Structure formats: structure tokens, C-alpha cells
Amino acid sequence: PYVTLKWAQNTDGNIHGHISTPLTSMLVHRERARHDAILVGSGTVIADDPSLDNRLYAGSSPLRVVLDRRGRVPAGVRVFRDDNVVYYSEAERADLPSVVKTAVYDSLPGVLSDLYNRGVTSLLVEGGAEILKCFIDSGLYDAVRVEVSPAAVATPPVAPLLPKSPSWIEQLDGNTLYGF
């Protein structure tokens, strides 16, 4: 699939906490509507219990993809609310809702291949920091969208660093958007 990495951070590089504005949140949901699937790691699901759907823009919600190598994500999280989710883990999970599609996690290229075989041609990777760094270090991405807010965030995790310059920069609602 065509892989887009997306995250929001403050000027210190911290990505934890609420960073997006109402307008930039709507743009995130537009990106979700334009992608077949959205991927996050177990840390993001455990910390934020996100819905990973499209509520703020016209269009459908993407397939939700959760990478959880060690089987740490609780069975009652919002991403498991219906059958529009694929869960990758090295651990066996008998406690997940029966609607959740499960697959064995072997590698990022293996996950991308499996998603492609499921009909996914575009994937939005929203984090967290560890997952984003893995995609960057592996070179398994086609585009990157970064939102930077001047607002302070209390603690790490720290956003990954990209080894290239942005192809576009846009000021929007007090935040700066970068495209790579």
C-alpha cells in the first residue's frame, strides 16, 4: 500500500497530549477518509483508547489496524467495537471480541503485504512514536504529514526525526503543517 506517516507535535518534538486544533483535526479526518486503513501501535491504544474513525469529514471510516506484538491491548478498547479492525500480534489472544480479525505479526513488510492482500492500497500510520520510528527506519513510507504546534506539551514521547526537508509548509490555525 501507499503509506503516509502522520503525527502532531509541539515545537520541542513532544507528541503526547492534545495538539491539533479543531480545524487541523478536521483535516486529519479528511486524511482518514482518503485512506483505506489507519494503523497505530499498542502504546497509542493503551494510552489514548482512540476510536480511529472518521467523524469530522464526509466519507467512510478506514479499516483500523492495531500492531500489538506482545498482546498488551485490553479486549474492551474502542478499536475493537466492530469488525472493521485487523489486530496483529505475536501473542495468542482468546479474549478478543469475536468480530476482530486477527493475524500473526511477523514484520512490518509482512503486515503491509497482508494488508495489501486484504485490499488495502493506502495506509495512514498515526503512531505512536515507536511505530513511526520503525516505519521511518525501515524506509517503509511514501509520504509524511507533520503538524507542529507552538503549545507546550508536558512530557515525551518525542517525535521521530526525518532525514529530509519538507516539500511543503502551511500555516493553519496557529499550527504549522509540513509535508514530506
How should these model regions be labeled?
Residues H18-I19, V125, W168-Q171:
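Short Gly/Pro-enriched turn/cap motifs at secondary-structure boundaries
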Residues P62, V120-S122, Y141-A143, N175-L177:
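Active-site lining segments that contact anionic ligands and/or coordinate catalytic metals
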